[in-house]
Amino acid sequence: MVDKIGETNTLCPVCMKTIKAEKIAEDDVVYIVKTCPEHGSWKVKIWNGVEHYKYLYEFAAVPKTPEKFAVPQIKDCPHDCGLCNQHMQHSCLNVVEVTNHCNLNCPICFATANGCGYDYHPDMETIRGMFKTVVDYVKSPRCIQLSGGEPTVRDDLPEIVRMAKEMGIEHVEVNTNAVRIAKDIEYLRALKEAGVDDFYMQFDGTKDDIYLQTRGKSLFELKEQAIANCAEVGIGITLVVTVSPNINLDHVGEIIKYAATKVPTVKGVHFQPIS
């Protein structure tokens, strides 16, 4: 039995035009069914478990529109680039890149740090301008993630955090590989005193053979030290796992069990799969 459970907009995978689609339930699986007048029809699986899919929609929040819009609507979403008036929701977490420098050279790197071919290490006034954009466009609560590269290579990161707080940004998260906060607890204390609320910490498993493949060196002991330091200082952590099918996919359960032993310092685990 096939039931229609909703409608949405999607893209033709051939011409990339925006087309209408139906969400259907069939054999306890949710699919999107779409047809492009020029290129035909597709049926795409999007979720296992119809009731679970519906249950998740109970958590949908009332959207908060942006304070203002940055660009005019020219075409339609997602073909325009920028914050146009089609955006019903303001930015929930604004990623602010403060460097492309890094103290690791990971075989797997989402930012291509140390290998992007140019140097990016903005001064304080440039960063102030980025923070002002967040304040101008985002309704409270304003949340940012300082990212890179590796933000903690900056000795002035506590000053950057303090500036964000003074400008009205309520929540400051730092994306980190944990190298510096494991080795330099006084630097960690300075970040805490400046106003860092939590760390988004790279964590690929509990065995060094995993890190040798994902990060190029043994790092598990360092990760444990970083967690211990954060527990001492009083800063929460989200463990961020790059999941590779050939490296640590079968280690996901062990990571969750490990994280549970580090509560309340570890607040959660975020899985980022790669193919």
Model-identified regions with their sequence ranges:
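Short, surface-exposed linear segments at secondary-structure transitions and domain or protein termini
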Residues: 50-60
